[in-house]
């Protein structure tokens, strides 16, 4: 058996090919093959050699269609990575086609073949060899189709995908969430794709593209963890199958912690659910950033005494609660949830970011000292959830029910579908603690969203009774009292009022609703590293072209102090970690960009506000001089602000000491510093535990 499987792998490497042009094939590399055990399950990356064209092309689904003049692209891919970030709200929204030719080895005969797409924005119709396979509506969840019966083993096969991101107001077909939002609605196959091979009897791949295994943490304490393992089996053969399901939990060293076994009979061409119970004594808990310990669950399926499928899933054991007065508790202990909201976006890449991009994002998140992220406003790629599991980042993840609803059965059903996909695809990630139902649902006038919100909340509870539901609101409305906990999106000091109003608002809300847990799901202000003014900065017009970095910094200083001093705020996620594409925006330094990020859209430059949070959240020694990029000054007398977690800082101007300052809030100020004509060297020095730390910059005054 093992020899045969090795022959199949060699055959795949030799003959599974991609079409760069008609009759011109490049063999897939060994890196494109992910071999899972010896169970007969195989995953082949399906990302290179796609042909692409914008527009609705007649007969593009046909197997013999000539696509030689189309562009060749690799996945992930979007057609809005450039026009979706340049402003004007005129980026292309409509259909486009992807095609790929590949040869299926004859050894695949008898295997089940599935195609999986990480996401497609927003409606995808899939064809294989000219035959319609299926349609998926929704721009952010993975989807899987069984294409076994559409393939011709030993011959060239063609898969064609029509993807459409037409604006909802242009077609009733596209009445799916989100109808509108403050981000570019990019089209494309903007996550990775794969071919997956299994034996006829296997763990299901088509249960809303879930892993087919659900690990329910029924009760977890410091002393024990009661678990239920549910495995969805599929039998795509003509005969009933007697199967044995063996499930094992392994510790991080690879040692077996617990094993259970169950027998089941699966009828032909049907599925079956197998439940298994187990208890783990004295569990090593997943404890966030402190200790993100992970077990591994391995489920093996045997048929006729042969191993026919095997799948692994992460397991992080934890228990938690939210208190309306004292905040969040993880494993019985107070645990501060502070962090960032994100978007899947990067300059010139759009939503087609890579896993390497996600790993860089995680490095930034870890470095700033965040303990939580809000995956706004939609489901993210699986790599981000995996990284959060690994590094102990608590996750709020949500569906794109943003701004408004539509009074139609199809809209409601699709929202339910997207929520089901979100929960089932991410059920086993220990980092995921909260299911988000909606965001700012009253922003656009429309039907009363309350019935749909209630329905979705009930669905989330049915799908997963172990996790709290949550929502992000900017309004005072009855929808605020549907989900288990709540986040408020408040922009005091940006869209209204003063930044100092935030604390007053939070106190009032808590006083009026003492039994309702409240957090901050969004707060932020725009800021450009190319726009500066002397301290103290003036509050700019939000819709104007001037968004100085100094005001953004001051906004976050005031806001964080209001949050930090109120223990009843159960979490806070600032808006946003990165600047991101929102093509309808006409403000700040660059049109088409929401510039509230504390790092630029290209992820290359950290703004001063980033360092404000780092000095508060990360205990590692640091010194940072603010306004570094304010390199040319038009006044000789300036205020210098430095962040540090040292108790004392000494500032030098052109090598001359301007004295030491002390601070209890990480902010150090030198006022009325007189710059010399020409270039000025500024250096801030701290001594922490006997080691010197410093930061340095150069500013010019005069010509």
Which residue ranges define each predicted feature?
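Secreted/periplasmic carbohydrate-active enzymes, especially glycoside hydrolases
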Residues: 1-10, 18-376, 392-395, 418, ...
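Short hydrophobic alpha-helical membrane-anchoring segments
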Residues: 11-19, 531, 579
